[in-house]
């Protein structure tokens, strides 16, 4: 009887962890809220990207 109880408890734990891992297929609400980094060069890359988009007033900075 003791082995049967342990077997039932282990089966219940395995099923509950499977349900928690799989979930119901919904994505978290804030998953798409994070902006994609379109300036991989960091702050300097962002500054250079802004200069390129607006037309650089000083030619050596534009590269």
Swiss-Prot record:
Phenotype when changing residue 57 to V: Abolishes the very slow conformation equilibrium
Database matches in InterPro entries: Conotoxin, Contryphan_CS
Propeptide position ranges: 24-54
Keywords on record: Amidation, Calcium channel impairing toxin, D-amino acid, Disulfide bond, Ion channel impairing toxin, Neurotoxin, Secreted, Signal, Toxin, Voltage-gated calcium channel impairing toxin
Signal peptide bounds: 1-23
Family: Belongs to the O2 superfamily. Contryphan family.
General remark: Exists in two forms, due to cis-trans isomerization at 56-Cys-Pro-57.
Name of this chain's protein: Contryphan-Lo
Organism: Conus buxeus loroisii
